[in-house]
A protein has these predicted regions:
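Rossmann-like dinucleotide-binding domain for NAD(H)/NADP(H)
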Residues: 66, 72-153
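A generic structural signal for short
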Residues: 48, 71-72
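Rossmann-like dinucleotide/phosphate-binding beta-alpha-beta segment
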Residues: 1-65
Length: 153
């Protein structure tokens, strides 16, 4: 959905392939190429051994355009200290996240030092908790329970 909204604003969207993998189709771009060309980089991947600290000092060094980095994946996908260093060094335009390596965010998390920066935004990871999202969740649950009961009578 992020790509759809970005395209509506006239943005060119690059979808990254997994690190080290050749693009599987024309819709995918090599990870390093995305890093080199992104003005805005949003993260939407699961946390796994392959994605832990996916964004780190080395990957930030490959970012040629000083992008805005948005992490809505998992906290561990981003190396907090690398982000802090990049903000201080002007390598990132800004940083936004609703996820942290430890939740709630630890008081000694390096990201806490950015809390008052003008281009840094931290929000709680609870978009699922809106009234509409909860109604939809309960509706889906009711449908699944009903289907289970009807199919097992």
């Amino acid at each position: 959905r992020v790509a759809e909204i970005a395209r509506a604003f006239g943005m060119t969207v690059l979808i990254a392939e997994r690190v080290g993998q050749a693009p599987r189709s024309a819709d995918y771009t090599a990870f390093d190429e995305v890093l080199a060309n992104a003005d805005i980089l949003t993260l939407h991947c699961p946390l796994s051994p392959e994605t832990t600290h996916l964004i780190n000092h080395d990957t930030i060094a490959k970012m040629a355009k000083r992008p805005l980095l948005i992490n809505v994946a998992r906290g561990g996908v981003v190396d907090s200290q690398a982000v802090v260093d990049a903000i201080h060094q002007g390598k990132l335009l800004g940083y936004a996240s609703d996820v942290f390596e430890q939740e709630p965010m630890a008081t000694d998390d390096p990201l806490m030092t950015l809390a008052t920066y003008p281009r840094v935004l931290f929000t709680p990871h609870n978009a699922w908790g809106s009234a509409n999202a909860q109604r939809k969740l309960w509706s889906i649950l009711a449908q699944q329970v009903s289907s289970f009961i009807l199919n097992h009578e």
